């Protein structure tokens, strides 16, 4: 005999009816498994309720200050990174930094002064820190803001 689609049945015990509480006098009847009287018998208790103890969300301090919605975020590149990525020197732009994987594309770039610079580089970026500008010019290069 071949198995047909109409012969298929769900596994025994896999399909059970939803328990209807509060119907009749059985184990889930009358008080519906909630016991007699008290808060939990009459209504739901919130998940955050800790039995009268001061709740954790009220014990912890609030966050101070605010986050400026109009702040401009910059991708950071240090002078040492430029020295490592471009040891031969030359012109270094944002596109070159993206190609080397130092920054994401379409990002504003700020050059900071951490590290040493030995090669002469002409860097063009959106912002420079004072120490970065000083190190680039000391190495014989130039710092151009876009």
From Swiss-Prot:
Here the segments flagged for biased composition (Basic and acidic residues) are 1-10
GO MF terms, alphabetically ordered: rRNA binding; structural constituent of ribosome
Q: Which InterPro entries match?
A: Ribosomal_uL15, Ribosomal_uL15/eL18, Ribosomal_uL15/eL18_sf, Ribosomal_uL15_bac-type, Ribosomal_uL15_CS
Q: Name one GO cellular component term.
A: cytosolic large ribosomal subunit
Q: Where are the residues of the annotated region Disordered?
A: 1-41
One GO biological process term: translation
Gene3D superfamilies xrefs: 3.100.10.10
Q: Which domain of life is it from?
A: Bacteria
Keywords in alphabetical order: Ribonucleoprotein, Ribosomal protein, RNA-binding, rRNA-binding
| Similarity-based family | Belongs to the universal ribosomal protein uL15 family.
Give the quaternary structure. Answer: Part of the 50S ribosomal subunit.
Question: What is the recorded function of this protein according to its Swiss-Prot or TrEMBL entry?
Answer: Binds to the 23S rRNA.
Name this protein carries in UniProt: Large ribosomal subunit protein uL15
Please name the source species. Answer: Mycobacterium bovis (strain ATCC BAA-935 / AF2122/97)
